[in-house]
Structures are given as C-alpha cells and as structure tokens.
Amino acid sequence: MDNFLALTLSGTTPRVRQGKSAGFRWRWLGHGLLELTPDAPVDRALILSAGIHGNETAPVEMLDKLLSALYSGSLTLTWRVLVVLGNPQALAAGIRYCHSDMNRMFGGRWQSFAESDETRRARELELSLETFFSSGQARVRWHLDLHTAIRGSHHLRFGVLPQRDRPWEADFLAWLGAAGLEALVFHQAPGGTFTHFSSEHFGALSCTLELGKALPFGQNDLTQFSVTSQALSALLSGVETSTSSSPPLRYRVVSQITRHSDKFALYMDAQTLNFTAFAKGTLLAEEGDKRVTVTHDVEYVLFPNPAVACGLRAGLMLERLP
C-alpha cells in the first residue's frame, strides 16, 4: 500500500486490501482510511489525519512521505495508527469543500446540515474512530489533525486544542513544542471539529496543527515544516524528541465572531494575519445594530473570514496567557 494517496485521489479501490510490510500489518479500510498495526504488541493508538479541507495539501504530502518511509523500512512503527485523508472528493478537486465545511460537523452536528458528501463522510469518520479505538486496549490515545490556514500568520506553525475538562498532559504539550509549533490556542467551549470529537468521545489528546498556508499539490515548500515532519517520524518510531528551547506561546479563546445575516461586516481586510493584535475598544464587526468590540486590553484574531455562511464563525478572538 505504497500508493495510498494516489488511490485516494483517484477514488480507486485497491485489488489487495491488506498485507504485511516492514514490521507492521496494514489494512485499507475505505477511501482515505488506512490502518497500520505493529507486529509487536503496543499500548498506544494514534489518529493521523489531514485533508479535512481539500485545498490544504501540504499536510497530505507530509503524511504521504511518512507512509513511504514506513513501507520502505527506514522508519519503525511503534503505534497503532489510523491514517485519515478526510475529504477525498475535495482533495481531488483542489477545493476546500464540495458543499459544506466538514470541520463544523463532528459530534453528530452533521445532522443539522443539508445532506451532502461531507455529512456522509463526517458520519463515516466518526464510525471509523469508534471502531479503531474500540478494537484495541490503548493506554495512550493521540489525535493529530494536520491543516494549513487560509491566511498568513504571525506564527507560521501553531496548534489549536479543543475544550477539555481535564488538564492537558505535559508530555503532549511538550511534543507539540518539539514539533515546531510557535503558539498553542486553547478552546474554552465545545465545537464541531474533528479533534473535539476525538477528545470528547474517546479521551484522546487531540490537536489541530496549522502548518503554513493553503496551496495546491506540488506547490508546497515542505522544508518549512521539516521540524514537524521530523517530530512525527520520531513519534511514530518511539524516539523521544528534544524539548523546544522556546516553548510555544499560549492563548485562550475569549470570544467568537459569528455571521448571522447578509448585513454582517467584519472590519479586517484580506491582509490581516492570524494573531494580529487589536487594542481595547476597537470595533471588529457590525451586524445591524450589534457591534463587536475588543473588551480586553489586547486581543488577537484567529481565522478571520467574512465570507462564511450565515450562522458560522467569522473569527475567534484570543487573549495571551502568561
């Protein structure tokens, strides 16, 4: 199964759906779904996902290179792994999504969207995670969902962590720093993301990794993310990564800007970078007689997007943590 990406993009079902490779067994579970199980018993399970948005290709290329290293035997596997290429049709078309944003649908939220390929895929991925985690006895469960951002950013690589009732484990946060993430953003409320679903329903330590800017296949400079790729290789092979000399900055979400109607106006232009700072009192958005302003001394914007569908998030506002 050294052609997993090509099969996924072409929508082709492989003639052989399972087999053995260098120290592990593999099973093709469906389009964009591949399970890897080491020959030796392990108590760690990892979801490695990318391509939830079809125009975010750099992480997909990174995963393809990692799989090639595993199949060639140059990389040893020490985790049970489920590799997920989230939205095969959008990946093949080179578009963010075909109908609706899948990363708003998880945790059963797909039921509130008009039925589409994305709603069916979100349901399929939920069931795939259920099967994967229930079929093993993993003591450690991680989910790394690899993305790229629509906009540029003051932090080239950053992580977004779902709301979690329990404290985050130090070794997980340390690994994120070792993977080159310059900032970590902590959600304070539930959401429909893939990582919130895996964290809430399966207790996984989950993070959305944002790695640079969305570009078409073949146009990515993967050297920008070599530190992340090296950290993933070390993780898969069970090699401890060195702690980052400069730990990631930490932010928490303090508010969400939501577009409710066509009267919505977001006062940020196309050049506004993620993590741009705004001073207290700054007018951020208006919708009819409703005004959204900065309420803390300084707030930072994340994922500003005035063109979202009504009812969806047009941006997050953050505050820096000590």
From Swiss-Prot:
Alphabetical list of Gene3D superfamilies matching this protein: Zn peptidases
Active site: 210
Cofactor: how bound: Binds 1 zinc ion per subunit.
Gene Ontology molecular-function annotations: hydrolase activity, acting on ester bonds; succinylglutamate desuccinylase activity; zinc ion binding
Cited Pfam families: AstE_AspA_cat, AstE_AspA_hybrid
Keywords: Arginine metabolism, Hydrolase, Metal-binding, Zinc
Protein known as: Succinylglutamate desuccinylase
Role: Transforms N(2)-succinylglutamate into succinate and glutamate.
InterPro entries the UniProt entry points to: AspA/AstE_fam (IPR050178), AstE_AspA_cat (IPR055438), Aste_AspA_hybrid_dom (IPR007036), SuccinylGlu_desuccinylase (IPR016681)
Annotated GO biological process: arginine catabolic process to glutamate; arginine catabolic process to succinate
Class in the EC hierarchy, top level: hydrolase
Involved pathway(s): Amino-acid degradation; L-arginine degradation via AST pathway; L-glutamate and succinate from L-arginine: step 5/5
EC code: 3.5.1.96
Cofactor: Zn(2+)
Binding site for Zn(2+): 53, 56, 147
Transmembrane stretches, start-end: none
Family: Belongs to the AspA/AstE family. Succinylglutamate desuccinylase subfamily.
